[in-house]
Amino acid sequence: MPTAAAPIISSVQKLVLYETRARYFLVGSNNAETKYRVLKIDRTEPKDLVIIDDRHVYTQQEVRELLGRLDLGNRTKMGQKGSSGLFRAVSAFGVVGFVRFLEGYYIVLITKRRKMADIGGHAIYKVEDTNMIYIPNDSVRVTHPDEARYLRIFQNVDLSSNFYFSYSYDLSHSLQYNLTVLRMPLEMLKSEMTQNRQESFDIFEDEGLITQGGSGVFGICSEPYMKYVWNGELLDIIKSTVHRDWLLYIIHGFCGQSKLLIYGRPVYVTLIARRSSKFAGTRFLKRGANCEGDVANEVETEQILCDASVMSFTAGSYSSYVQVRGSVPLYWSQDISTMMPKPPITLDQADPFAHVAALHFDQMFQRFGSPIIILNLVKEREKRKHERILSEELVAAVTYLNQFLPPEHTIVYIPWDMAKYTKSKLCNVLDRLNVIAESVVKKTGFFVNRPDSYCSILRPDEKWNELGGCVIPTGRLQTGILRTNCVDCLDRTNTAQFMVGKCALAYQLYSLGLIDKPNLQFDTDAVRLFEELYEDHGDTLSLQYGGSQLVHRVKTYRKIAPWTQHSKDIMQTLSRYYSNAFSDADRQDSINLFLGVFHPTEGKPHLWELPTDFYLHHKNTMRLLPTRRSYTYWWTPEVIKHLPLPYDEVICAVNLKKLIVKKFHKYEEEIDIHNEFFRPYELSSFDDTFCLAMTSSARDFMPKTVGIDPSPFTVRKPDETGKSVLGNKSNREEAVLQRKTAASAPPPPSEEAVSSSSEDDSGTDREEEGSVSQRSTPVKMTDAGDSAKVTENVVQPMKELYGINLSDGLSEEDFSIYSRFVQLGQSQHKQDKNSQQPCSRCSDGVIKLTPISAFSQDNIYEVQPPRVDRKSTEIFQAHIQASQGIMQPLGKEDSSMYREYIRNRYL
């Protein structure tokens, strides 16, 4: 049943910062530039942030008048040319936040963005460039000698590297949560909207709501999950002061999207990784967990499958599967003071009651439900104890915690020594992982927003009937989560997550009616596309945490990697070791400063003077906790009560308070996703459309030979893949390198912030950026001697690919058909050469083509009924009269036929 609810689209998507000597004016507007908001920032305060939001929605004319008055009021001398009192400082696409070190505040703005994915018409952008502006005026600035050093440390966090945001889609939550909120009962939405208005009434915010009546649409905006928000500390100072549309929450991790073309039907495969901002850091400096249950290198990976034929969240088909990686939830670390490739693992603190593990798993129960499945990939048998220390402690912690849980909600522990199986020549690592993946997906299920297809009901599959999760009238819900870990949670973990994701992808495709069995084979276009997404996902996460790309990939464990891969693995190992030894400490300081773990304070030790950051991440070492959790009832009672459903998705008073509900007219811009996606008010280039530029299975993976099966689920031979028919070796390497670099950043040109007042200048800049397509292969100049080889290479594939060679002459039959086509076109457009108007003497010779069909040229508004002959009319009238009891007399032929029938039947 369609719901009358939609996500609220932010009305602040374009920003222009204007500057005077005393103030900054930040003007924000929506994409159509029909609604504006204004922030006023005081520049006369040396250390405090004074920001005013009048919460009024301006029109374009009102904003121009306001800026004109500000310009006139800030001129130094009346009538003096070239001395405008209002300067345009910078254009932007969003506010990252405000930060202060030892002097005044800085504002961080997003000045460049790139579209990375599209989910139901909701665009996901990657931050491409930022600008950091000091707010106080130079006349009131109080300088400090260490300010520049803090600024350099803060800017070491590269905001142009894998930071993502959206104006309408909550990236901190899963697709299951976002769609569950939209499907809430209307009665609860009405009550929540009334309660919100009673608690905080705003004359500007609620203006016009009372007169809307019952024909409106509920707009819903959910509170972000702050664990995965990376600029929460930067926005905290203005959260209670400004309108919510100014708050742009940013996640860190990975986002990639590819198009699976199934016989012309586009299906988008999206991979989103959310890196936790709690206990974040680099490889050897952040291990285990902190006192609050947050673990190092915790990443939530979600794969989303959607039918791109329908854009709406309510009418479209969407499916998702979520899994998690993270360090072993214990107090452990590795000493990097000694120059060793594998520093020894030490347990820093005894935890016999598994206190930190209890906090961690309680958080997982609340967000994901049950069962929680742990896939532990660390080594179990070693000559010298190293990784086995973690396995023994983790088993003891899980065993202790399971004593007090209900039997149906106990934590499932799966140990598997992946390194041992990899060294064995008789064991296939991926086959064993596939068995584990099947059992995991059957227990957790996955999310899909539509009921089972009718074809799956007619032809049920055994595996489908055994699938777990929660079945609801509108589809299925994923209950529970797979938590995968090794020591670093990088190479082995990424391969294991790929195999589980591949298994879940088969079920997702089956649930949408795209395949007949929930099973996918290797060496198909679909799996190759999915594998490339996961490799880019693993490389990105490995660079963020370990300082290098993946060392061991899926092909390594399949044992089909070429011999050159071994040298690349060695280089990645050396790169990771160098990064861990020399640059991780500086990166850790930058992360601590960016996330607000450390706050510079006058008179206290500086960040670089601290011997360790242990006390920054473990708050209980500096003060006593007000309350201590029970060692037996270690869970939250409300969370256990609603299992296997995740408590965050249960409709209750606590969760309803996290929602902002507002009623809109049906076609208002705040909820009109069609207007937001297509932007009819903008002139856009068809070649730069995101859906055409993204990686496609048909263009990038399917072989180009004639007569090939176009299905992306057909198993290809290694020499039949799309990559093997790209031409000679150099061209093939260039194409592969280009696709690898563009996999994590789709090709459409990034948008650079421009304002409406300088459209002429901005158009030139944007054309220069987007003039060279990133999909084009670099052209190499050839000598004259090589022209014959080049011609041969071009002509030969044309015959193989298209079955025709243009160098051969046309046959007589083809030539006559083409000549007839040309003559037909010339006769239709006869004109006098000296005049642009058709000549009168030629009008008689113009061929008038009329359709030979019996039907007229109808349209959707009017249909002309066809002519019916007399005999057909009489038959129809006799049929109508027969239904009324008026029978027609039988003819001679009918009477003789009936007599013959009676004679043969009874006589």
From Swiss-Prot:
Cellular component GO terms, alphabetical: early endosome membrane; endosome membrane; Golgi membrane; intracellular membrane-bounded organelle; late endosome membrane; lipid droplet; recycling endosome
Keywords per UniProt: Amyotrophic lateral sclerosis, Charcot-Marie-Tooth disease, Disease variant, Endosome, Hydrolase, Membrane, Neurodegeneration, Neuropathy
Transmembrane residue ranges: none
Catalytic activity: a 1,2-diacyl-sn-glycero-3-phospho-(1D-myo-inositol-3,5-bisphosphate) + H2O = a 1,2-diacyl-sn-glycero-3-phospho-(1D-myo-inositol-3-phosphate) + phosphate; a 1,2-diacyl-sn-glycero-3-phospho-(1D-myo-inositol-4,5-bisphosphate) + H2O = a 1,2-diacyl-sn-glycero-3-phospho-(1D-myo-inositol 4-phosphate) + phosphate; a 1,2-diacyl-sn-glycero-3-phospho-(1D-myo-inositol-3,4,5-trisphosphate) + H2O = a 1,2-diacyl-sn-glycero-3-phospho-(1D-myo-inositol-3,4-bisphosphate) + phosphate; O-phospho-L-seryl-[protein] + H2O = L-seryl-[protein] + phosphate
Enzyme class: hydrolase
InterPro entries membership: Fig4-like, SAC_dom
Region of interest (Disordered), residue spans: 707-788
Start and end residues of each SAC domain: 154-547
Main location: membrane
Effect of residue 486 to S: Loss of phosphatase activity on PIKFYVE
GO biological process: locomotory behavior; myelin assembly; negative regulation of myelination; neuron development; phosphatidylinositol biosynthetic process; phosphatidylinositol dephosphorylation; pigmentation; positive regulation of neuron projection development
Compositionally biased intervals (Acidic residues): 758-770
EC number from the UniProt entry: 3.1.3.-, 3.1.3.36, 3.1.3.86, 3.1.3.16
Impact after mutating residue 41 to T: In CMT4J; the mutant protein is unstable; low levels of the protein results from impaired interaction with VAC14
Subunit details: Component of the PI(3,5)P2 regulatory complex/PAS complex, at least composed of PIKFYVE, FIG4 and VAC14. VAC14 nucleates the assembly of the complex and serves as a scaffold by pentamerizing into a star-shaped structure, which can bind a single copy each of PIKFYVE and FIG4 and coordinates their activities.
Disease named in the record: Charcot-Marie-Tooth disease, demyelinating, type 4J: A recessive demyelinating form of Charcot-Marie-Tooth disease, a disorder of the peripheral nervous system, characterized by progressive weakness and atrophy, initially of the peroneal muscles and later of the distal muscles of the arms. Charcot-Marie-Tooth disease is classified in two main groups on the basis of electrophysiologic properties and histopathology: primary peripheral demyelinating neuropathies (designated CMT1 when they are dominantly inherited) and primary peripheral axonal neuropathies (CMT2). Amyotrophic lateral sclerosis 11: A neurodegenerative disorder affecting upper motor neurons in the brain and lower motor neurons in the brain stem and spinal cord, resulting in fatal paralysis. Sensory abnormalities are absent. The pathologic hallmarks of the disease include pallor of the corticospinal tract due to loss of motor neurons, presence of ubiquitin-positive inclusions within surviving motor neurons, and deposition of pathologic aggregates. The etiology of amyotrophic lateral sclerosis is likely to be multifactorial, involving both genetic and environmental factors.
Free-text function comment from the UniProt entry: Dual specificity phosphatase component of the PI(3,5)P2 regulatory complex which regulates both the synthesis and turnover of phosphatidylinositol 3,5-bisphosphate (PtdIns(3,5)P2). Catalyzes the dephosphorylation of phosphatidylinositol 3,5-bisphosphate (PtdIns(3,5)P2) to form phosphatidylinositol 3-phosphate. Has serine-protein phosphatase activity acting on PIKfyve to stimulate its lipid kinase activity, its catalytically activity being required for maximal PI(3,5)P2 production.
Protein name: Polyphosphoinositide phosphatase
Gene name of the record: FIG4
